[in-house]
A protein has these predicted regions:
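Short helix-initiation/N-cap motifs at beta->coil->alpha
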Residues: 63-72, 192-205
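Extracytoplasmic substrate-binding proteins
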Residues: 20-27, 91-167, 188-190, 197-199
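A short, structured surface patch at a secondary-structure boundary
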Residues: 27-91, 100, 184-187
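His/Asp/Glu-enriched short active-site or ligand-binding loop at hydrolase and phosphoryl-transfer sites
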Residues: 52, 61-62, 174-198
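C-terminal motif of bacterial Sec signal peptides marking the signal peptidase cleavage site
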Residues: 13-14
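Stable alpha-helical elements in mature extracytoplasmic
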Residues: 34-38, 44, 70, 87, ...
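Sec-dependent signal peptide recognition
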Residues: 1-8
Length: 208
């Protein structure tokens, strides 16, 4: 019997079956580009049996459309765990019905989320030591940068998309938090964001 895995419970529940295996025996499907990159940075790419279509890998692996794939389509791959950033296409319910382990790791909204997710992935693929070293080095470098940051009254507008509308970032997003930490005035912080997504939509008039 496989068990449902959710981010906050991962470190406790994974020990029931998945983390008992050697890392090169764990079969991971990553439907999140960010977490594919984390796995590669921890030198655990041998765990990947499939990745989303935006992940860049230089080794043979099945490529999957994370927006449309169903749990039924993933089941024949026999994954030990599926990594998700979003619940596209109702896949979470499908994975639960198929009794396939999954980890839901939504986009990080601050540095602590980033560190926590790296360490979570490290635990998942038996690279705890590498994950700890990575987050330790990141904290040192980020603190050094922040200590030396001096942008005065600098303001910034960060546009992240135009194909489906004009979108920016506010302080509810990781990028927005970085700007806040640097002391930069982020213009989009004052833009309405009704869903609290961290990525407010702007009109062309607001953009100008």
């Amino acid at each position: 019997m496989k068990f449902k895995l959710i981010f906050l419970a991962l470190l406790f529940s994974m020990c029931s079956n998945v983390t008992q295996e050697a890392s090169n025996e764990i079969r991971v499907v990553s439907l999140s580009t960010t977490h594919t990159e984390i796995i590669q940075s921890l030198e655990a790419e041998e765990t990947l049996i499939a990745v989303d279509s935006f992940s860049e890998v230089d080794f043979p692996v099945e490529v999957i459309d994370a927006y449309t794939v169903t749990a039924e389509e993933l089941a024949p791959l026999n994954p030990d765990v599926v990594i998700l950033a979003f619940d596209f296409n109702g896949i979470v319910e499908g994975l639960e019905n198929q009794e396939i382990n999954y980890v839901l790791l939504p986009p990080a909204k601050n540095f602590e989320d980033v560190y926590s997710q790296i360490e979570t992935i490290g635990s998942l693929v038996n690279k705890e030591s590498e994950a700890f070293s990575t987050t330790r080095d990141m904290k040192i470098e980020i603190n050094r940068i922040l200590d030396n940051a001096n942008f005065g009254d600098t303001s910034v507008y960060h546009e992240i998309g135009y194909s489906y509308g004009i979108y920016s970032v506010n302080s509810d997003s990781l990028i927005g938090q970085i700007y806040n930490s640097l002391g930069v005035v982020n213009i989009a912080n004052n833009t309405e964001d009704p869903f609290g997504s961290g990525y407010p939509a702007l009109t062309e008039e607001q953009d100008i």
